[in-house]
Amino acid sequence: MIANWVNQFGKSKTNKLIDYLNQSHGTDLRINLPIDKVESRLLDQGISWSNSPNSKNFIRINSGLRKILSSQIHLSGKVFVQNRAAGAVVEILNPKPSETILDVCAAPGTKSIYIFQKMNQSGNLFASDINSSQVAKSFKRCNDLELSIDWKVKDATKDIFPMADRILIDAPCTGTGVISRNPDIKWRKDSKDTDKMSAYQIKILLLPEAQVA
């Protein structure tokens, strides 16, 4: 893996990447309320956090994550545990109200929820995943939050999807981009895994592209 990085990025950038991935970066939290309304609730629970440098919709939790997960503010959908990079993907998609959007390979649905909220809950969001149990959990979560996202079990390599204005495909991957959160990936993945996953990703990416209106 390191050899591939050196070939692709050069030694200097690879060393910087390794240094970054060997560090702990805390947990990101997406907020659906003005920060001043969230701040007091976090402080009351003794939770340490800091602002995200490039988004008013995210903060970084430094300590107290377990308190967040069991808090009413989290259970009611006022805040979501969501990686800042995953949120940036939704912002690049730039969903608009009244559009029809596909979210493919969407479970567990955190990005789907962000997309629908960006749409002001107006329009059609079709979310799908091949894992039926994950789809059931995602549907229940959205239903509990009163979000009318249309969840379906679909195989993105062969099933038919509705026409859409925009498509987000979070294709399955080797996970090497999140080594800082899952360091054991360094020892569990090799070049064969990468080649196999790349071929699978291409099959997924080619099928829904014809569904963009």
Where are the regions that the model predicts?
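S-adenosylmethionine
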Residues: 1-213
